[in-house]
Swiss-Prot record:
Transmembrane spans: 21-43, 68-90
Key word Transcription present: no
Keyword Protein biosynthesis: no
Cellular component GO terms held in the UniProt record: chloroplast thylakoid membrane; photosystem I
Protein name: Photosystem I assembly protein Ycf4
Subcellular location(s) per record: Plastid, Chloroplast thylakoid membrane
Domain of life where this protein originates: Eukaryota
InterPro entries hit by this protein: PSI_Ycf4_assembly
Function of the molecule: Seems to be required for the assembly of the photosystem I complex.
Principal location listed in the UniProt entry: plastid
Keyword list, A-Z: Chloroplast, Membrane, Photosynthesis, Plastid, Thylakoid, Transmembrane, Transmembrane helix
Any GO BP: photosynthesis
Family assignment from sequence similarity: Belongs to the Ycf4 family.
Protein source organism: Aegilops tauschii
Gene that encodes it: ycf4
Amino acid sequence: MNWRSEHIWVELLKGSRKRGNFFWACILFLGSLGFLSVGISSYLGKNIISILPSQEILFFPQGVVMSFYGIAGLFISSYLCCTILWNVGSDYDRFDRKEGIVCIFRWEFPGIKRRVFLRFLMRDIQSIRIQVKEGLYPRRILYMEIRGQGIIPLTRTDDQFFTPREIEQKAAELAYFLRVPIEVF
């Protein structure tokens, strides 16, 4: 979601609360519960869930492996659920031409640096950079080069949904708004 006026540009970006993450967390959770219940059923020698016949499965080695896969899947699905709950990667970029200030805010994993907040002057922005790598794993990333602070990514490195035309258009609009040149590398 973007909001623009004559002097302010605010761009809100989704973090880990995407439809795909919800889908994979649920699928992984249900699948790992199935594996774990089959492993436990093979240990007990009776069916816990009637849909999953596990009396024919020996506990050693198949039941142990199924239990291990179930526990590993529960850990991975709990990791996905935590990233969704904490909204890791959610952020906004605010460019204010009137005050000459750029603010970049990012949510990270809980800890000392959970909130990353960068604030700098617009006159310190040297250029908008586009990185384009084609091939099997294409990458199209938009960066902002800042004097004294290096290069800051403005788009996610995992967003592969930008076509070359979309990333060029976004870079051109932002460069025009900020009145800085565009570099492609």
